[in-house]
Amino acid sequence: MRRLGASLAVLILAPLLGGAAAPGMTPPDLEAEGWRKATWSGIRPAEFSRTASRGVRIRAEGQGSFIARPLSGPAGCLAWRWRVDAGPPATDLGRRGGDDRAIAVSVGFAGFSPSAGFVLRTQHAMAQASAGERPLPRSALSYVWGGTGREAAGQAHGFFQSPWTPGITNLRVLRPADAPRGQWVEERVDLSADWRAAFGSAEVPPITELVISVDVEDTNARVDAQVENIRLVPCR
């Protein structure tokens, strides 16, 4: 996986985030619900399709790409359910190269992490000036089905920095690659608590965007997965 953490709104920020991305062909039924597809340069795009239950099905074989849609408001709790019927073997998501995964559900935020330095902020400001009125996410949390599950060893909060977008994206493995397949799994995450844990700041910025991605370019594995009913919910 080369460029997880880049979102559709950050296409112009691609050099900053670790690679070039470009708009892809979005299926009309997904586009009608606000999704936009994008592809990574040099990687064959995966297939995203709408399911009868208004979810998203992802199919890939040695491919990778993502879809994104706006999601605005305070960082509350995010819930969804997903399943993987076929996916890649366990890979180390904490290192560059070979870091494949079946699905990642990522959320973009309006604010920088405390660790974002002058260079990163300056590059972002230049990209924002070129992007126009649509705000570009400045940080992201990515929840992954894949990996070994040991990438965040020693971290009590379970997050680790993306090897491709340090300072912008922190990842957390919710389901490792060897998790049971062929069955639905319900998820609920507290975005506010997770942002504080991952980035070390008490002030949590608003959320801006939702991204679903897949990448099996390195292992050339096959993916057949679904995610549905993604929604903001009250935190219990």
Where are the regions that the model predicts?
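Extracellular/luminal beta-rich ligand-recognition
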Residues: 107-165
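Solvent-exposed strand-to-loop "edge" motifs in beta-rich extracellular domains
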Residues: 81-87, 110-112, 192
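Short carbohydrate-recognition loop motifs
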Residues: 45-66
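Extracellular beta-strand ligand-recognition surfaces/modules
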Residues: 100-105, 161-171, 176, 181-221
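Extracellular/lumenal carbohydrate-interaction signature centered on repeated Trp-anchored short motifs
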Residues: 68-78, 178-181, 203-204
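Extracellular carbohydrate-recognition regions
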Residues: 19-42, 118-128
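Bacterial N-terminal signal peptides
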Residues: 7-18
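Beta-strand acidic-aromatic groove motif in beta-rich domains, primarily in extracellular
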Residues: 88-109, 115-118
